[in-house]
């Protein structure tokens, strides 16, 4: 029997609140914290998750849970939504990639097709690519940077406009 455990990150506490209700309804044990959680209580929650294998889910806000903690008890990371700064999502996923991790880690990004999520993901990839180029860790990228940025901004604007139009016809 596999004993997979997961970290679920969202940048919205309202999403985490909904997930809490869903997990409680399903009878799934969980722990979690957000930026509102007392700093002293955070390590207690991390220790509880780490030491109790009957708790399969740790719910965390992306920014509060993305830095300075070791959560190798989990081997799944779910990014429920994306941060506009891809480094915050990268920091969040890195919670599982630490010394002591004994299982392969799987990262899942929830992206809704045809929504602004796709555009945010494209922008995030572009930002990470540029960061790699600046740090010398990536090969030269084909194409005009200004044109790519303009294309992404145009896709985001089109997506927002389509959503506004859809709502106005309802």
Residue ranges and their predicted role:
Residues 1-170:
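ASCE P-loop NTPase motor core, strongest for the SF2 helicase catalytic module
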């Amino acid at each position: 029997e596999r004993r997979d455990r997961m970290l679920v990150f969202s940048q919205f506490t309202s999403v985490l609140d909904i997930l809490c209700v869903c997990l409680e309804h399903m009878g799934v044990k969980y722990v979690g914290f957000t930026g509102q959680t007392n700093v002293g209580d955070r390590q207690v929650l991390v220790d509880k998750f780490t030491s109790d294998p009957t708790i399969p889910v740790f719910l965390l806000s992306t920014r509060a849970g993305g830095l300075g903690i070791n959560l190798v008890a989990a081997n799944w990371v779910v990014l429920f939504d994306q941060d506009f700064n891809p480094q915050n999502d990268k920091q969040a996923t890195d919670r599982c990639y630490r010394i002591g991790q004994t299982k392969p880690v799987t990262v899942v990004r929830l992206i809704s097709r045809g929504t602004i999520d796709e555009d945010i993901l494209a922008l995030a990839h572009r930002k990470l690519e540029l960061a790699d180029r600046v740090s010398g860790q990536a090969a030269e990228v084909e194409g005009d940077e200004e044109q790519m940025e303009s294309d992404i901004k145009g896709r985001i604007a089109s997506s927002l406009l389509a959503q506004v139009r859809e709502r106005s016809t309802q």
